[in-house]
């Protein structure tokens, strides 16, 4: 039987309404922190309220609103490794690549402790999940597929949203993004829960039926 005894909390941070996630298994004292944004204080408050340490910091991609909290998280939890897709790792140190320079600021992050590749399986904090690379919004965007759950769930960053998809006009590719969504998300069960980098959660089935940018075939 699938083990669904887990908790997930979302912290939405201004100014980009970016979603950070804290994920942990019931009965454990460590958690995964995904895409720490500007509001690290609220992330830490959730960790402290649940008496959790940080097992790892995961970035779905390297855009500044999703990596800006990395430095504060690493300072607070220095033993927690930082993981990001291999093809977005350069964004951590390059304000042009992570788009913060376009806003007149220079956001940088500590370097990755581990770079992730498509198809890799990661085991952390009692979880086992698959990395799937879906470029198009950024060169190395990855999603984390927790296929051990019923229904499965995906932490998807800015690849797909409820009723929309990630921007492709900042050095991305719409055909590449749509192809990746169909190949690596729409092949999952319709009940799969999608936790995006902005906005509310949705499901694979809902997006296949109604997403105006990329319908299921």
Question: For each predicted feature, which ranges?
Answer:
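Active-site HxH/HxHxD metal-binding segment of metal-dependent hydrolases
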Residues: 38-123, 152, 209-216
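Conserved beta-strand hairpin/beta-sheet module of binuclear metal-dependent hydrolase folds
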Residues: 2-50, 143-157
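Hydrophobic residues at beta-strand termini and immediately following loops
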Residues: 11, 116, 134
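Metallo-beta-lactamase
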Residues: 29, 52-54, 96-101, 121, ...
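Short Pro/Gly-enriched beta-strand edge/turn motifs at strand-loop
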Residues: 1-7, 100-104, 126-127
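Conserved S/T- and glycine-rich ATP-binding loop of Class I adenylate-forming
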Residues: 23, 60, 134
